[in-house]
């Protein structure tokens, strides 16, 4: 008995091994385009195991490659007879008709197949996927569309949206999106995500806007289309239109200006300062009793500051008006947690735009003592205070401020900025070895700007030291930069004018031209500054400041000239 069992097992193993070998060989023939050899093996294998979907599909594909229409049809019909519920096989039969250019026959067959299989949700899904498997996207869409007619739009909206998207059928997708959110508002987030992808960067979004407006008019009681219209305006970056829309929604829903405030903040992020200002002023206009009154005042101040200082030529009158606005805010609310951000802006204005460094120092020293402020905000105040001290010539206190931030935020961008400022201060003082040692650390800083600045300053030191034993030329140049930082134009210009005569063979020529351009720009002599920047990138195109000079020249040309 054992012998018979062993023989049977051995025979079974041999048969399986032979079949496995034949499968591999058939697949290899098929991949190599040797279809006739593959066909013989697949025919044999399929007879042995007609339930194998893998063998069936490979055999069918081989017959199609050999243009064996009758055999292909017989094979599929056999599969349908053995597995009548398997819709993949039924789609395959129509696919065979198409493959052999029997289009009318295929169309009649597919129309009948779809008509008979759209009553159940799972049936629709399987049939549509069967069409997609054979790259028959239009038929998959037809299946979903017929399913929608039978079972409602919500049953297949996700699949149909995806099919329209994959076939670039933007108009039908948009119309479907309207129907879906009208039928079920809970689909809004999903549908808007799809629309954002389809209408990326506002491309061809006029149709979307038109349809949204139409549905909003047809369904005035359904606020969801007003919400969608707001999304459309934002996607198109039409912030003025978005503000009008959000004002309407805010009023309708008694949001107390909250949504307008949020949109104004978004406008600031996108540098749409005029629209942001209008939004903040609207919320302020609601009155002091509204909860968003103070935040909107702070937002307005921040927007006005960013708008005013964005230009390389800030308007002095606008600076003065903004200073007055901030002072009024602080007078009404005091120096506290709520007004600290606006006071920080006031300090920046006084230090950098109003030639009143002392006032800026007093403000910052007051902010730092204010309770409940976040440590990161206090650190930002200390960095600005360090700059202000430095402008006053108070080097020791500047180092102290930078050092405190560096120590507290060692691995953070704030700490790296503080370390860079301290390295720059050492550079101003002529301590190039120490400055370069700190800059080398910062070359791998997480913040790209700090890393780039560190690399640039380190290269400046490296390229212009070691040429003489005293490094006097570089020290004088660094001192000139320091004087410019302090707005001491006379001292800076005096050094720059003498440097080429004192050190005629030095490599600082491009740096001198560049710093002279910065002096002229700071004085408002933009034409002269532009000439000097142009000289830098034309004469010294290979040097480290050429890109900076080109950038400054472009900014002056765009904003002033």
Can you say where each PLM-predicted feature lies in the sequence?
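Short non-domain terminal segments
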Residues: 9-10, 418
């Amino acid at each position: 008995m054992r012998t018979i069992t062993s023989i049977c097992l051995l025979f079974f193993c041999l048969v399986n091994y032979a079949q496995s070998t034949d499968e591999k060989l058939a697949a290899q023939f098929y991949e190599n385009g040797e279809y006739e050899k593959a066909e013989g093996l697949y025919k044999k294998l399929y007879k042995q195991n007609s339930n194998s979907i893998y063998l069936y599909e490979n055999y069918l594909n081989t017959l199609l490659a050999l243009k064996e229409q009758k055999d292909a049809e017989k094979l599929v019909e056999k599969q349908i007879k053995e597995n009548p519920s398997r819709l993949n096989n039924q789609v395959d039969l129509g696919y065979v008709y198409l493959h052999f250019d029997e289009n009318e026959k295929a169309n009649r067959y597919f129309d009948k197949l779809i008509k008979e299989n759209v009553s159940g949700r799972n049936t629709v899904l399987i049939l549509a996927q069967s069409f997609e498997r054979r790259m028959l996207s239009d038929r998959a869409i037809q299946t979903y569309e017929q399913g929608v007619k039978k079972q409602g739009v919500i049953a297949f909206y996700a699949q149909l949206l995806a099919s329209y998207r994959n076939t670039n059928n933007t108009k039908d997708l948009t119309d479907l999106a309207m129907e879906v959110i009208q039928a079920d508002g809970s689909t809004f987030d999903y549908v808007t995500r799809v629309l954002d992808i389809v209408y990326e960067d506002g491309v061809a979004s006029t149709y979307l806007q038109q349809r949204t407006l139409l549905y909003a008019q047809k369904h005035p009681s359904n606020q969801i289309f007003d919400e969608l219209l707001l999304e459309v305006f934002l996607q198109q970056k039409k912030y003025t239109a978005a503000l009008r829309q959000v004002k309407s929604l805010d009023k309708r829903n008694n949001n107390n200006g909250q949504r307008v405030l949020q949109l104004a903040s978004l406008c600031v992020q996108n540098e749409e300062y005029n629209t942001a200002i209008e939004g903040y002023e609207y919320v302020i206009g609601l009155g002091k009793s509204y909860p968003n009154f103070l935040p909107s005042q702070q937002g307005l101040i921040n927007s006005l500051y960013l708008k005013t200082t964005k230009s390389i030529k800030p308007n002095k009158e606008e600076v003065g008006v903004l200073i007055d606005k901030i002072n009024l805010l602080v007078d009404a609310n005091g120096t506290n947690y709520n007004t600290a951000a606006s006071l920080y802006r006031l300090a920046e204005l006084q230090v950098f735009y109003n030639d009143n460094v002392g006032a800026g120092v007093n403000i910052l020293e007051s902010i730092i003592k204010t309770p409940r402020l976040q440590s990161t905000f206090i650190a930002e105040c200390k960095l600005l205070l360090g700059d202000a001290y430095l402008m006053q010539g108070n080097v020791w206190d500047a180092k102290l401020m930078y050092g405190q931030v560096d120590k507290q935020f060692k691995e953070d961008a704030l700490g790296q900025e503080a370390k860079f400022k301290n390295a720059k201060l050492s550079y101003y003082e002529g301590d190039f070895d120490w400055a370069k040692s700190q800059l080398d650390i910062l070359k791998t800083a997480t913040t790209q700007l700090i890393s780039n600045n560190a690399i640039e300053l380190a290269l400046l030191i490296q390229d212009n030291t070691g040429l003489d034993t005293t490094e006097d030329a570089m020290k004088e140049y660094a001192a000139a930069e320091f004087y410019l930082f302090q707005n001491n134009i006379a001292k800076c210009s005096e050094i720059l004018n003498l440097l080429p005569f004192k050190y005629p063979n030095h490599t600082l020529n491009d740096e001198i031209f560049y710093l002279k351009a910065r002096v002229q720009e700071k004085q408002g002599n933009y034409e002269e500054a532009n000439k000097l920047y142009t000289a830098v990138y034309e004469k010294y195109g290979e040097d480290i400041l050429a890109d900076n000079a080109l950038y400054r020249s472009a900014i002056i040309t765009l904003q002033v000239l």
